[in-house]
UniProtKB/Swiss-Prot annotation:
GO BP, sorted A to Z: acetate metabolic process; acetyl-CoA biosynthetic process
Record PANTHER family: ACETATE KINASE, ACETATE KINASE-RELATED
Binding site for substrate: 90
Protein origin, superkingdom: Bacteria
Paired cysteines (S-S): none
Keyword set includes Coiled coil: no
Keywords of this entry: ATP-binding, Cytoplasm, Kinase, Magnesium, Metal-binding, Nucleotide-binding, Transferase
Protein name: Acetate kinase
Originating organism: Staphylococcus carnosus (strain TM300)
Site feature (Transition state stabilizer) residues: 179, 240
Gene Ontology molecular function: acetate kinase activity; ATP binding; magnesium ion binding
Chemical reaction(s) catalysed: acetate + ATP = acetyl phosphate + ADP
Regions that span the bilayer: none
Pathway: Metabolic intermediate biosynthesis; acetyl-CoA biosynthesis; acetyl-CoA from acetate: step 1/2
């Protein structure tokens, strides 16, 4: 029997949704409500190749959910709210409390709230979405799906920082990792494509968008990942620095007179590709600029690829080899140039990739390795919403 599930991503002033039929994993409708609580609130709903837009004042998430449900009914996408069997909600941080998705109860809500200091920008907004749906659709299961859960299988030696141990015990300071729902989806999909049990595969998953993270997945479990206590750690990103020497923070403060908060802002919003190039955080712009001979754009691309290279090499060593390299997310799926830069020179570890196949894949699924390559290289468009919907069915006992 099929279930209709809403996959929800609630922001502080926005609400993204997809209505998905499970187990067929068919997208029935998707939409976005923007500027909740602000002037110029807007709703967009897409279904059957059509697009509906409307503008009206939307004061809070409860009203936003009400309007969304009304539109789904008015547009004939569902007959009434009883057609919806469950909801799944993206929650950014589950800390160590949630090693897997969870059916939302009052206690689970409190636990998510208790993790606010680990994700002050995201968890409160995610929780607003959960509470709105629980209020308006009380008779169905609501499931929280955490970005961090997939990485809770990392061993201690991977997640602990070399700090006094009591900082971990007292304050929860450790590597958590992010993009877990995406890494989980593409690794499972890779096993499906290859027709092999995931338990037999060593996978390096490269989620490369404006934010980027690399994950080492051994036997279907995350054993390491590049992001850390926050999404600032790891590889160079669009505007985030990735890994730096921590002593640079007080040094920059001393040299510039800026506060720790201001320096952190620079590391999050003015660094990465934008910081090095001085022009853009968008890889498409930088590829164009590099073609035109702009040296700093070229340098930004070289640094970007070099950092990803480093993680791929270290994760191959960690797993004593690799069977599959996956590229996913906006850049990983669409930029053959970035993929080429990252794959260049990896023949020593059994990666033989086909430039022709690589240049033909943009946003579609497929192999870019030569048939004889011991390591398979696959482009897989991520689908976090489907993963959220699957977990809504599983943990909601639908």
């Amino acid at each position: 029997m099929s279930n209709l599930v809403l996959a929800i991503n609630a922001g502080s002033s926005s609400l993204k949704f997809q209505l998905i039929e499970i187990p067929e994993e068919k997208l029935v409708s998707k939409g976005l409500i923007e500027r909740i609580g602000l002037k110029g609130s807007k709703i967009t709903v897409e279904y059957d190749g059509r697009k509906f837009t409307d503008e009206k004042e939307i004061n809070d998430h409860v009203q936003a959910v009400n309007i969304m449900l009304d539109n789904l009914i008015d547009l004939g996408i569902i007959r009434d709210i009883n057609d919806i069997d469950g909801t799944g909600h993206r929650v950014v941080h589950g800390g160590e409390l949630f090693p897997e998705s969870a059916l939302v109860t009052n206690n689970v809500e409190k636990q998510i709230e208790s993790l606010t200091e680990l994700a002050p920008l995201h968890n409160p907004a995610n929780l607003m979405g959960i509470r709105a749906f629980r209020k308006l659709l009380p008779g169905i299961p609501h499931v929280a799906v955490f970005d961090t859960s997939f990485h809770q299988t990392m061993p201690e030696q991977a997640y602990l920082y070399s700090l006094p141990f009591h900082y971990y015990k007292d304050y929860g300071i450790r590597k958590y990792g992010f993009h877990g729902t995406s890494h989980k989806y593409v690794s499972q999909r890779a096993a499906e494509i290859l027709g092999k049990p995931i338990e037999e595969l060593r996978i390096i998953s490269c989620h490369i968008g404006n934010g980027a993270s690399i994950a080492a997945i051994d036997g279907g479990e995350s054993v390491d990942t590049s992001m850390g206590f926050t999404p600032l750690a790891g590889v160079t990103m669009g505007t985030r620095s990735g890994d730096i020497d921590p002593a640079l923070i007080p040094y920059i403060m001393e040299k510039t007179g800026k506060s720790a908060e201001a320096v952190l802002d620079i590391l999050n919003k003015e660094s990465g590709l934008l910081g090095i190039s001085g022009t853009s955080s968008d890889l498409r712009d930088l590829e164009q600029d590099a073609e035109e001979g702009k040296t700093r754009a070229q340098l930004a691309l070289d640094v970007f690829a070099s950092r990803i290279h480093k993680y791929i090499g270290s994760y191959a060593a960690k797993m004593h080899g690799v069977d599959v390299v996956i590229f996913t997310a906006g850049v990983g799926e669409n930029s053959d140039e970035v993929r080429a830069r990252v794959l260049e020179g990896l023949e020593f570890m059994g990666v033989y990739w086909d430039p022709k196949k690589n240049s033909q894949l943009h946003g579609t699924e497929g192999f870019i390795n030569y048939p004889h390559s011991p390591v398979k290289v696959i482009v897989i468009p991520t689908n976090e919403e489907v993963m959220i919907a699957r977990d809504a069915v599983k943990f909601g006992s639908l």
